[in-house]
Amino acid sequence: TATNTSVVVNKFGPNDLGYIPATPAELGGWTGGNATMVNNAINSGSFLLQHRDHGYEQGWGEPGYSSSNIDGLTNTDLTYVFSINCLTGKYNMAGECFAEKFHRYTYNGNNSGALGILAASEVSYSFVNDTFVWGMYDNMWPEFLPTYNSTPVERGILPAFANSAGKYFLQASSWPYN
């Protein structure tokens, strides 16, 4: 467990917002997914894909999903990807990083993969990433953190604006330091 696990469970768990269980065991037989499940979700038309765990230049650690798995996509409804972890957007590396592959991918000559992707270009820090994501979600769904009182204008409730909102939330928040 991370140092701030109790803070997160107290806020988002059954004693406050109720978004998560008190312990992972309460999730039942959930295994965390795999590359096939990720591709099936995207190919079925998922609007938004969120990954918040370990990442590297060519993909995600848990569940394992890499640039080569993107070749299994056949979607024509493009998804938006929040890849909030280390290095998946490392555009300055030799060759194509994970975010570039996701964004440029085509299937049978048609755009496939992602319409847009938000990904870190360098190493990022876990609890800071969590706090950033909470700010993004509260911008897109203002009731996510009811006590934060965000009031974005309707045109601002989009993934691109959520990126900025997450940064403002992180700057104003004491979360990473609790």
Spell out what each predicted region is:
Residues 1-178:
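Cysteine-dependent hydrolase recognition
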